[in-house]
Amino acid sequence: LVDPAVADSLQPALAAGLDGVTVRFERFGGECTHAEIDRITAAAATPGSAAEVIVAMGGGKTIDTAKAAAIRTGARMVIVPTIASTDAPCSAVAVVYDAHGVFAETLRFSRNPDTVVMDPDVIVAAPPRFFAAGIGDALSTFFEARSNAESRTDNYVAGGFPRTLAGLAIAETCQAVLRRDGIKAMIAVRAGLCTTAVENIIEANTLLSGLGFENCGCSAAHGIHDALTRLDETHGLLHG
């Protein structure tokens, strides 16, 4: 499943790397809706040629759609993010919207993606605002984790189980990396450079934030975000 924004530039390289493997490319429809999930599920479950692996190449909504389809079909999940704008790649959840971009629900899955592959050069080549949005999303991880810990709120993301100390430690590390390397990384990304700080922020935006929110839960920041999606003026804004 390929995001149309990167299909022309990245799809040929992906196809070449999968020489000898039967591959079918589907272009993402632009919104993670139930209808789009149904469409991709049907494509992946075609009788006689059902997909063994679903690969998602693109941003968070492309990734969430592919994850939902993989869960429905039993296929393995390989995630290839082309931007570091959210912590969707590593998580076992998908955020579903309606056709107008209004938040509908969050789907929770029984398993996480099998593999996440990120090329820092691809991330740096994307518009810097996506990288900044990923920092914004990841910045909420520690504060929401701490909020849940201090209020002794169970982790609803994980079905009501208590938080883990390891999860809270990861959320704290995520925050520390963002504060230490965030500004340096943004300067580098705007200059088109891949530096150690950039690679650290890619890890924080994607892995540390993903593990942090799944093991500690979300709180006010994401609740306010979900409500704001009901305003038409917010539909062009990024999640972070």
Predicted features along the sequence, with ranges:
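Short glycine/serine/threonine-rich phosphate/pyrophosphate-binding segments
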Residues: 7-10, 34-37, 61-67, 86-90, ...
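ATP/NTP phosphate-donor binding region
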Residues: 1-53
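A short, small-residue-rich loop immediately preceding and capping a beta-strand
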Residues: 47-69, 73-82
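Alpha-helical scaffold segments in soluble metabolic enzymes
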Residues: 13, 39, 43, 68, ...
